[in-house]
Amino acid sequence: VIASVRGHCYTGALELALACDLLICADDARFCDTHGKWGMVPTWGMTNRLPERVGPLVARDIMYSGRVVEGVEAIQIGLANRCVPEAELEATTNDWAETVATNSWHTLREEKKQMRLLAEMTREDGLKWAREKGPGVAPDMIERIQEGFKR
């Protein structure tokens, strides 16, 4: 899932964007957590996802202060994967989605599953799990390799 953000992305919208796998924003994007301003507490995963994405120190700053993070800074702190001029956001998002979609959906699904699963393990246990229990190949591997040789 790719979040494509332009303009304001505050509080609940930020929580939804953080739930996405990838995030692209326009240079006019503004991210902010206003839970504290309104006396609310995050319930959609921000307290997990924001520190995972930007690190605990930066997450505390954003959450405790309620400060605005501009699009370019979002790249610098790891909140967004890409930042583009607002006029190019839709086309760039579509191009990115098409590029991702050309890959094996079996592989993408397994990678996403493994990233979630292995995040809960030690590095050593995660490497062992991937080596011993990871599928290693996707069901469409042979077909995709054969198609690659035809080009």
Where in this protein do the model-derived segments appear?
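Crotonase-fold acyl-CoA enzyme core
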Residues: 1-105
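C-terminal alpha-helix plus adjacent terminal tail
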Residues: 66-72, 87, 91, 95-151
